[in-house]
Amino acid sequence: MGLIINPYMVVAAGASVTPPFDDYGNPTAGYSMRKLDSLYSGSAIRVREDSGNTEADIGFDGSGDLDTTALLAHTSSNSGFIVKWYDQSGNSYDITQTTTASQPKIVDSGSVVEINGKPAILYDGSDDFMVQTSSMGFNGSTAEVNHYSVQQMLSSDTTSIYIGGQSNVYYWVYTSGSSSTAIDSYCGPPTFYKNGTVISSPTRGSLFTAYNTDAQTLASLTDLNMQYFNTTPTTNFNISNALGGSAGWRMNAYVQELLFWRATDLPTQADVEANINSYFSIY
């Protein structure tokens, strides 16, 4: 299959998917296993291999996908763990984890971790989480945000929090069988969508039923209010961690993409969802 590349689009003959930030500018942050902006020249991830603990930045191949050839050249037959997930928005809101035991996995004994044929980051549900220490500058009128993410939540993970800070600031809580409507704290309440369809009157239990299906899903969350992620002592924006670092709430899931836009810069939700689905072939 031939590749056609221009400054605005990464194209594989027969299957064109424009990087989302090309069409929908001014994102707050973006993390992905694909290139989100055709003009982005940085890396996707920084990876530690677990034999000699050497680290390397891994970028993208000519079609805008994660460069798995470079990734496996770095890890060889060893496993690889995420030290840093680079923000492609231009705002430098990189997500990091320097504690080796808490780094999620991208290579398992020489094989790239994948879901639906594309690389994914695996959070083990025990001690894995990543941190964005500047909280993305959320405050006041700039705190209203839409969140889009691609993940595969596991049915065996019955109680977790996807995004959390400290001092009981968090959102997207799921618990199997729970009728509790406390799905966020100081964050909304957000409206949840699965694969473009709204989840009406969400509870912790219905979110578990919707997302924890052992299948890849696209989640869209609108009307988030993120100002308390930028209020002392909540100075961190964490993936798979909340409640002051309580390990009991860490998630067991694969994550491939995580995008944020502020309310003042929001693209049309359906357009973003269509772009994501065109690339990942979720539904």
Give the residues covered by each predicted segment.
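Short, low-complexity N-terminal tether/leader segments at secretion or assembly junctions of large
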Residues: 1-13
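N-terminal module-boundary/linker segments of secreted carbohydrate-active enzymes
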Residues: 11-50
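Extended recognition patches within non-cytosolic domains
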Residues: 13, 257-283
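Low-complexity, highly charged intrinsically disordered N-terminal segments
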Residues: 37-84
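Short, solvent-exposed loop/turn segments at the edges of secondary structure
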Residues: 40, 116, 144, 234, ...
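Short amphipathic beta-strand/extended segments with alternating polar/hydrophobic composition
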Residues: 53-64, 132-133, 173-174, 193-203
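Extracellular glycan-interaction surfaces
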Residues: 74-78, 83-127, 148-158, 164-167, ...
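Extracellular glycan-interaction patches encoded by glycine-rich segments
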Residues: 230-256
